[in-house]
Amino acid sequence: MDKNRDEIKDLLRERLIQARLEHKLTQTEEGKLVDKSKTAVASWEQGLSMPDPVTLKRLALYYKKTMDWMYGDEE
């Protein structure tokens, strides 16, 4: 079944929080890794917005996760 935009946003939000907490980073620290503000990171984690593709790829590389994992397509 194809996921709709809201489902993808929810899964991505959950994965961003999970990855950040696994690495024991604050929202401010994560933002600095990708040249974004704490406010931007908080917005992603609240599901209000999504990181742009380049930023998401940078986070995935830092966290050693695949893009499929970030989008909730693999465990």
Predicted regions and their residues:
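A short, Lys/Arg-rich alpha-helix, primarily the initiator
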Residues: M1-E22
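Helix-turn-helix DNA-binding elements, focusing on the entry/boundary residues of the two helices
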Residues: L16, Q27, K38, P53-L56
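Acidic active-site catalytic centers that drive phospho-/nucleotidyl reactions
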Residues: R20, E45, D68
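The alpha-helix within a helix-turn-helix
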Residues: R20, G31, A60
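Short alpha-helical DNA-recognition segment
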Residues: K24-Q46
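DNA major-groove recognition helix of helix-turn-helix
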Residues: E45, Y63, Y71-E74
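DNA major-groove recognition helix of helix-turn-helix/homeodomain DNA-binding modules
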Residues: V54-W69
